[in-house]
């Protein structure tokens, strides 16, 4: 009997719907390129624009593009009627926690339309994510080891193969974001009732991003020196704690800590009380947060209150994460994708929030107090099955802000990409 081969979710979306509605995408023209690909494959693509930033990257002159500039309370009924009138079979968005997208998921489910969410890549770099019914901790995938082991024989690609590199990093995203927010702010009158998931003022971002560049230059030499010390074993046995963006939905929605700061202080308190005296802890600032927030004062204050930690807490900014993953004892995270990077390096990972990869056999399931003393690495066979499932099904080679590889027209072979 021939084994069923699992398809990538982009192919599953293509094969499951004729009339597809796009909501908000990532900043930039990715949704316009997605629409072109869907249209080339015979689909009818509809699009809702919610602000002038959307208009700039997906012009309202495009076929079946609708400007929604009514108030937020009117959106459920508007969407309900549109889905019914145009026989929408799939609703697609970027991020499933934005106000309009939360409503869209409910309305889609009530009308037997599938709901698909794009997200930044689970496995980075060079990947983006597409899941049905939700992403991150809202992913519907089972949190059971047996599921991924059972699915492994159905995967077309069972051995890891490096993805095609694409241009990424901060610059292409920042360029798209600056243009998006400039347009959004310049044309607020067209969308007076629009509710944004972040600060809509372009000036809110320009100053921090400028400060971020200056800080990057300031930390450059120090970061190089820290990386050399790590490689030389100067920090001895250490744990790595990668911080997340202060206003990330992963923090706001998928964990019980009120802030990244509260998470940091909780981890430091546990480390001070339970970690072996011969271990250190390295706190890694998130590069996207460089111009917005700094935790050095909090760390210094904590060390002053816990003098036994003097010389054992290291705060770093732009040292590449793999430097720490190659040498650390383990990682503590809220639910960052950095956890997956740690697991790839066979590093024990302790998750303190809700994460799609927090699965027995993959992440450490003991308490944080126990983790400091007995960190448990992932089961290699299980994690390989987990990783390959995602690379086959939920991950797409590319970067939202530069280039994404779409399957060739009219083919079910999603391993043969075109741009």
Swiss-Prot record:
The organism of origin for this protein: Neisseria meningitidis serogroup A / serotype 4A (strain DSM 15465 / Z2491)
InterPro entries named in the record: Capsule_polysaccharide_synth
Protein name: Capsule polysaccharide modification protein LipB
One GO location term (cellular component): plasma membrane
Record membrane topology: Peripheral membrane protein
Function: Involved in the phospholipid modification of the capsular polysaccharide, a strong requirement for its translocation to the cell surface.
CDD domains the UniProt entry points to: beta_Kdo_transferase_KpsS
Stretches of the chain forming a coiled coil according to its record: none
Keyword Cell wall biogenesis/degradation: no
Keywords: Cell inner membrane, Cell membrane, Membrane, Polysaccharide transport, Sugar transport, Transport
Localisation per UniProt entry: Cell inner membrane
Single GO BP term: polysaccharide transport
């Amino acid at each position: 009997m021939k084994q069923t081969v699992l398809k990538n979710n982009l192919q599953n979306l293509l094969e499951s719907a004729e009339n597809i509605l796009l909501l908000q995408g990532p900043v930039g023209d990715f949704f316009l390129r997605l629409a072109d690909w869907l249209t080339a494959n015979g689909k009818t693509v509809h699009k809702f624009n919610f602000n002038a930033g959307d208009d700039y990257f997906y012009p309202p002159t495009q076929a079946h593009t609708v400007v929604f500039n009514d108030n937020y309370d009117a959106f459920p009924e508007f969407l309900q009627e549109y889905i019914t009138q145009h026989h929408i079979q799939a609703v697609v968005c970027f991020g499933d926690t934005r106000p309009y997208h939360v409503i869209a998921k409910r309305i889609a489910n009530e009308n037997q339309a599938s709901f698909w969410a794009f997200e930044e890549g689970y496995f980075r770099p060079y990947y983006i994510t597409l899941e049905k019914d939700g992403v991150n901790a809202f992913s519907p995938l089972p949190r059971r080891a047996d599921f991924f082991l059972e699915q492994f024989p159905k995967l077309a690609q069972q051995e890891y193969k490096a993805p095609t590199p694409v241009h990424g990093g901060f610059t292409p995203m920042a360029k798209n974001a600056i243009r998006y927010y400039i347009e959004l702010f310049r044309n607020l009158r067209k969308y007076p009732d629009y509710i944004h998931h972040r600060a809509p003022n372009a000036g809110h971002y320009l100053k921090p991003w400028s400060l971020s560049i200056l800080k990057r230059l300031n930390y450059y030499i120090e970061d190089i020196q820290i990386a050399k010390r790590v490689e030389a074993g100067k920090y001895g046995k250490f744990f790595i704690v990668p911080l997340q963006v202060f206003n990330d939905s992963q923090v706001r929605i998928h964990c019980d800590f009120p802030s990244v700061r509260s998470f940091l202080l909780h981890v430091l308190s546990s480390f001070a009380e339970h970690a072996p005296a011969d271990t250190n802890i390295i706190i890694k600032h998130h590069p996207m947060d460089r111009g917005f927030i700094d935790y050095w004062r909090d760390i210094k204050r904590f060390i002053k209150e816990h003098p036994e930690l003097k010389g054992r807490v290291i705060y770093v900014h732009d040292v590449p994460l793999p430097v720490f993953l190659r040498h650390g004892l383990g990682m503590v995270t809220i639910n960052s994708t950095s956890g997956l990077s740690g697991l790839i390096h066979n590093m024990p990972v302790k998750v303190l929030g809700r994460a799609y990869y927090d699965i027995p056999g993959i992440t450490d399931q003991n308490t944080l107090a126990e983790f400091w003393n007995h960190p448990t690495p992932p089961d290699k066979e299980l994690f390989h099955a987990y990783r390959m499932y995602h690379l086959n099904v939920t991950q797409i080679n590319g970067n939202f802000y530069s280039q994404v590889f779409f399957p060739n027209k009219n083919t079910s072979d999603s391993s043969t990409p075109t741009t």
